[in-house]
Amino acid sequence: MSTIVIFLAALLACSLLAGWLIKVRSRRRQLPWTNAFADAQTRKLTPEERSAVENYLESLTQVLQVPGPTGASAAPISLALNAESNNVMMLTHAITRYGISTDDPNKWRYYLDSVEVHLPPFWEQYINDENTVELIHTDSLPLVISLNGHTLQEYMQETRGYALQPVPSTQASIRGEESEQIELLNIRKETHEEYALSRPRGLREALLIVASFLMFFFCLITPDVFVPWLAGGALLLLGAGLWGLFAPPAKSSLREIHCLRGTPRRWGLFGENDQEQINNISLGIIDLVYPAHWQPYIAQDLGQQTDIDIYLDRHLVRQGRYLSLHDEVKNFPLQHWLRSTIIAAGSLLVLFMLLFWIPLDMPLKFTLSWMKGAQTIEATSVKQLADAGVRVGDTLRISGTGMCNIRTSGTWSAKTNSPFLPFDCSQIIWNDARSLPLPESELVNKATALTEAVNRQLHPKPEDESRVSASLRSAIQKSGMVLLDDFGDIVLKTADLCSAKDDCVRLKNALVNLGNSKDWDALVKRANAGKLDGVNVLLRPVSAESLDNLVATSTAPFITHETARAAQSLNSPAPGGFLIVSDEGSDFVDQPWPSASLYDYPPQEQWNAFQKLAQMLMHTPFNAEGIVTKIFTDANGTQHIGLHPIPDRSGLWRYLSTTLLLLTMLGSAIYNGVQAWRRYQRHRTRMMKIQAYYESCLNPQLITPSESLIE
């Protein structure tokens, strides 16, 4: 519930913000020049100031109706006040003046940056390098109502009917009227090619794109609750980066270019270097700033009437017929190789992080199978599964009766500590062959017989048969001694179990001492000859305990070895069939876990525990479900099928996203790496090609007859 409330609140806030932005933008469209003075302070127009403005506009209208020297009246200028005229904008800025050819008594045009303003002509003498200006809105041009402390209100009180003639002043920050006339042909916006020269190189956008790649990577390793926020942030960063790189510039960001016609002249002294000469060229009152690589080609236009396009900061965009920044960018595009390098490096970083931190085997297999169209297979018999034609990526659901595989040393298993050891129920052997019989061992039977014979004589029970009378046995027990009433049987069972010379050495030595024999062979001969029948041996309790421990220690290796051997003998299934393997080590059987692991039992109990496990797991029901990740057939003809648990919806999206991110990073690294190299090579030769282009245009080489292609 709280998540829905937060989402609705965020949606409402975004809607309000979008509405406010749309309202502000629509208002700025009505006053397009307001953007140029975004940092200006504002105040309200006072009644006295409004009265002075109205009087000035009335007198201006009367003067403009007077015919000029040629008999033509001046073009009407609409400077009527409107609803926005009550807002006064205050700013400090430089004023640029251009002269025009017209009968207008006020033949100058004034600009603040790219915005033309109406400046009362009697204030021209007060223009400085930096001017404190107050403006108000009108229907056409912004009207200056105050300049450097001089106001219309003061002027209208002091002077009436001032002839609107320009007053030359030596205090102005611009050249006087003795300068040559400049004709303003047009005012246009810069082209996209010209804008590209001042546009940033895209390093910030490249870093935003790399940051979005990193956030997409973290979406794969963070909990699901954070994934929507990370993915949303990554999409916003990616969108911002791509928009900054490829979006066309907004109209408001395109600077104005003034198209002028005049005669450029060099005002420098003789002996100046090339850099000083290129900076000392003026067009009338305007000091021109040329691109450095134009220096060899501007001399031919000096002293001649030429069309020149400039920014308000006096930087040239075009001069004459050939020199043009627009044509340079159009014919020889800018090569931003550094941003491609940054994106390629970021893609490689994320690619290496994917390779080392994220398991890619399952996402790739799942994605490929999903693209190929995987099938769902259900089988309850070996024949059904064999006829289904299982492929990697298929969803498999099988059930039946099989055998848990035996884990052997040197073989890999996803489950490191199975409770059914030595059986591994995450691997099921499934075939139609007869079940293997329960394991048997003659050595284990002999070890068990020896252990039981010693236990029966050392720890007799009242109901056990004995070769001595009950009264004698009772008397011996009361004396604290232990009676071995069939010592020969122990010797024979020991000889039967420990047939090798090095087997049970300590036990044999103990029995030799108890039988007062020369060596073990002599003792065995006596037992085989029946000379030990009826021989009773009395033992102290300590000796009896030592004999019991010796028997347990001597029989343990035989039982342990036979248990391992029997387990390995089960690891030889019949040819053919299937081996179903869980990639994550999940058990396919629903059997109760043993109370303890097989190898945690004492050696004398391991064999019985192993037989119980074998009886339960050699023919057990199982259910296996998952996505097929691998299929191969071994030398025995058994088909191995690896299964990965079926992921939930979140897991499926993670698999697809991992593959998509991997392929995207690989493609981005290759593409941007190649682009960075190519752009770097072109960037190195771009200026030489531009100069060669200007040389061919300004100094064309005539083709001699011998070089003509037409014979």
Swiss-Prot record:
Endoplasmic reticulum found in the keyword field: no
Periplasmic topological domain residue ranges: 1, 361-655
Name of the encoding gene: yrfF
UniProt KW keywords: Cell inner membrane, Cell membrane, Membrane, Transmembrane, Transmembrane helix
Subcellular location(s) per record: Cell inner membrane
GO cellular component: plasma membrane
Membrane topology label: Multi-pass membrane protein
Lineage start: Bacteria, Pseudomonadati, Pseudomonadota, Gammaproteobacteria, Enterobacterales
Organism: Escherichia coli O157:H7
UniProt cross-references to Pfam families, sorted A to Z: IgaA
Source species, domain of life: Bacteria
Family, as annotated: Belongs to the IgaA family.
Principal subcellular localisation of the protein: membrane
Name listed for the protein in its UniProt record: Putative membrane protein IgaA homolog
Residue ranges of the TM segments: 2-22, 205-225, 226-246, 340-360, 656-676
Keyword Membrane assigned: yes
Record topological domains on the Cytoplasmic side: 23-204, 247-339, 677-711
